[in-house]
Amino acid sequence: MNQNFAAIILGGTGQVGGAVVAELLAIPECREVVMVTRKPMTARSRVRNVVLDTGAPDFAEQTATLASEVFSQGPASAVSCVGVGSGSMRWSEEELKRLELGVVGAFARGCHDAGIAQFCLLSAVGGTARSRF
């Protein structure tokens, strides 16, 4: 089996992210899925869980360190499935920006700084005419 790429994913525990992880694991060439989460999760084959504080001021740097290690083992892509569901209507604009721009932006910067050139963003922000973004 020729396993020649890895994926580092943020937001892989939600409904959309879980589907992305399942699809990645169905690809024989995917050597590893590295899930960045806020809490430890149950071990799975070909899935590595790395717990990081997404609110930490150095989250981008922590991500860059992790992404560099993943990328050093061969080709890698980054995926963000971070998003907010219908409950987000209760969130302030500042809270939404902190998540969608702050956390996702820091993750993207960290992956880019590590040399990962492919970044996939799955987001519903701005997906409707009523979007606050």
Predicted regions and their residues:
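Short, polar loop motifs at secondary-structure junctions
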Residues: 35-42
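N-terminal Rossmann NAD(P)H-binding glycine-rich loop of SDR-like oxidoreductase domains
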Residues: 2-29
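Short-chain dehydrogenase/reductase
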Residues: 10, 14, 97-101, 131-133
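NAD(P)H-binding glycine-rich loop region in Rossmannoid oxidoreductase-like domains
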Residues: 7, 48-106, 110-113
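Residues at the starts of beta-strands that form the adenosine-phosphate
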Residues: 6, 31-32, 117-118
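SDR active-site strand-loop-helix element
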Residues: 10, 36, 81-82, 119-125
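A short helix-coil junction within the Rossmann-fold of NAD(P)-dependent oxidoreductases
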Residues: 27, 110-117
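Conserved catalytic-site region of short-chain dehydrogenase/reductase
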Residues: 87-88, 125-131
